[in-house]
Amino acid sequence: MTFPKENINNYASSSFNYKYLIEEFLQWSSSCNRISYPTKYFDFLLVIIMTFVFLCLVYLLIWIEVLLNSSRPDPKHRVYYPRTNFWQRTD
């Protein structure tokens, strides 16, 4: 929150000189508002890259979970059919 310059004296106290600190803060905050175009572009790319990495990690975790939870059926429940040349489940 920035204070208007005409209201600086309203926030000043008699015990300490806050006017100087408020003026310094106003000067610093006004200089921070000037962000260059490459900085904005870099921030945008950073957000895109972080989103992509996050989605890849989520996909990887889901894929690992699917692989770990997919178990083959017991050999008792599988029968080999010679004419089709592959195993089929009976249950």
Swiss-Prot record:
Tissue specificity field: Expressed in the nervous system.
Protein origin, superkingdom: Eukaryota
Biological processes annotated in GO: regulation of potassium ion transport
Signal peptide: none
One GO MF term attached to the UniProt entry: potassium channel regulator activity
Subunit structure: Interacts with kvs-1 in the nerve cells.
Name of the protein this chain belongs to: MinK-related peptide, potassium channel accessory subunit protein 4
Gene name of the record: mps-4
